[in-house]
Amino acid sequence: MVTIKEIARMAGVSTTTVSNVLHKKNARVSEQTIEKVEKLLAENNYIPRLGLNALTNRSSRIICILITTPEFARGSAYETPFYGNMLGNLERLLRENGYYIMIFSDKNVEEIEKMTVGWNVDGIITISMPYRHLKKIAGLSDIPIVSIDMDEMPEGDEVYYQITSEDKSGGKEMGRYLIGQGVKRIVYLANVNHGADHLRFVGVREAVREADYKVLLEEKRLPKDYTQREKCYEDFLKYVGTDTALFFSTDVNAAEMISFLHRNHVKVPEEISVAGMDDDIFASIVYPRLTTIRVNVEEKAQTAVDILLKLIRGRNVEKNVYKTSVKLIERESVKIKSLNT
């Protein structure tokens, strides 16, 4: 296997220059030298010896991504479109900056803690980790940490670097949209009653309170088990034909509900409206296509990577809490109010 020293000799440059090209530290390297070194690296099939760096005190170029598997997940977190989309964006962005990812997901936070201190990583990105666990992990080392969608965060606590969506605004925007279509009842269905799911409900509740006419609002928590969820869905068949909208905290469950309604010969949206949140892959492939709130996953990932790289490089980060945009995506699953009514 060719070494950095051999590449440097062939290119007529120092090993430091080759290392800078490898790690995308190109500020002091000319374009001509970069092209020359990259060509030699490709021609000689150079493979970085990352494993050695990970076991020493040197920079490993590895970023650890810690995922707290949601309690409502059927299996691993990776089965959920949101996590797959987020991981794909993080991997691409970090690779473009010369870093590699190590992923660890578990419902057992103690296992995650062991993972944190067991490897020499340059930084950590957590996804959906409860505040109390993030606080504990942050106290185990000085490794820079950025949190995406921190759960159970105390109000006003801005100690840790965190990225989240405008969940409350998203819920309110959907609530206003549904009310604008003349619904008389909104049923909000979520997997949990805290974190993003709860904030989305708070937004819907505000929209209902500000409505020009009386709108009934119900909040339901979805069972973890699929069979139990089916029984839960049966309860809402009584609302067919009553100007009701079922607003789910995730598109996955909204698509599941539409499938259930089809099997029970209920027409969506003619007899009942269904809406979701996230705008994941299910929103555009289910029939009818789902009206939803788009959560900008790419913006979340980009913001997290930008902040983490600043922390790793010792640069100033302007603030601790960043909120990314949301957007109403109108498709065909909500009954549109007639202009004649």
Predicted regions and their residues:
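N-terminal helix-turn-helix DNA-binding module of bacterial transcription factors
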Residues: M1-S59
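Amphipathic helical "hinge" segments at domain boundaries
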Residues: K5, N44-E113
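Short, solvent-exposed amphipathic alpha-helices that sit
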Residues: Y78-E96, G170-E173, G195-V215, E256, ...
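Short beta-strand elements in bilobed, periplasmic/extracellular small-molecule ligand-binding domains
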Residues: E91-S105, R185-Y188, R205-R229
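Flexible loop/hinge segments that line or gate small-molecule binding clefts
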Residues: I127-G170, V252, D278-L290
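Hydrophobic alpha-helical segments within soluble ligand-binding/sensing domains
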Residues: Y161-Y188, H198, Q228-E234, V295-R313
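An alpha-beta-alpha
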Residues: K172-Y213, N320-V334
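Flexible loop/turn connectors
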Residues: E234-T341
